[in-house]
């Protein structure tokens, strides 16, 4: 089976370890083990005591009861624990969910631009994939009327990313309700990758799981919860889809493992402290980035809506990938070129790095851009 490379992952696999100033990532500045230990005010005693009781075997295949209980708290409706399945990050959740639903010849609508697996996996499985575009002239938002035109009586799946990667667009509860109404009219599933939880205007945000009965939602502790090292995600779906996913999980991961499950559970148990920390990073760093952009005549963006991923447009006479390679080689600064998201003439800016990395990365990026004016 041939499948396209994921442009952003291929880029990071090659270049991220060469960076001195990494402002490409979309995780909110990753927690150190020291910061994690401090969450329980007992130097991590509750985490280590849990591990001390456990044998280092496979553990709970689908995720421990404690893990599932913490995940269930993230949704407004009551979620059956049997419908929460632990996965290898959100990437694994998306893979298993799409494989469980999509068959050759199916019609799939995918938000675009977005994280490539949401449209490349269905295409590789033999589906006809049409794009529902985020439009720059609409402030990088999609047009609901366009979705109505795209949907067909036999549309099987609509894939969305809320918030979107790399642009950072957040679809509010009203928009999700309209998507649900359109999907319901033809009986389509809606897969919503929710790994980027918005940290502002949260009263306007709802999970697709709380909006639509045929929603499939995916998430992880990697981005908003700053713990990608755990490699733990989850998928929430109805009984039929959950049972199909169980079969695919046996082929793709078996289990998350005792240690990873315990770490992810501990993170979710202390999510309020983590989110308080991360709001300060998101809002403070966004202000830093905005001030820098305001002083740059070659850079623009639509400011992200309280999420950790953003896209800057670059007005430069050089292909974005060549510019990013040169920026890394000459100044040690890492961005992800927009062409890796099929968005040329820009870059993903990981503005939620540590403040010192962001400030120096932007300063050096500004130096590189100034060279075009000499």
Where are the regions a protein language model picked out?
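N-terminal small-domain helix-loop-helix segment of the aminotransferase-like
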Residues: 2-89, 269-270, 371-374
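PLP-dependent aminotransferase-like
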Residues: 44-45, 82, 100-160, 181
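Conserved glycine-rich beta-strand-loop-beta hairpin in the small C-terminal domain of fold type I
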Residues: 265, 281-290, 301-314, 345
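PLP-dependent enzyme catalytic core of the Aspartate aminotransferase-like
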Residues: 148, 317, 326-335, 341-374
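Active-site phosphate-binding strand-loop segment of PLP-dependent enzymes
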Residues: 136-203, 210
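A short helix->loop->beta-strand "cap" motif at the edges of active sites that frequently abuts
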Residues: 106, 127, 185-188, 213
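Conserved core segment of the aminotransferase class I/II
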Residues: 213-283, 290-292
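Helix C-cap/helix->beta junction micro-motif
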Residues: 125, 185-186, 296, 331, ...
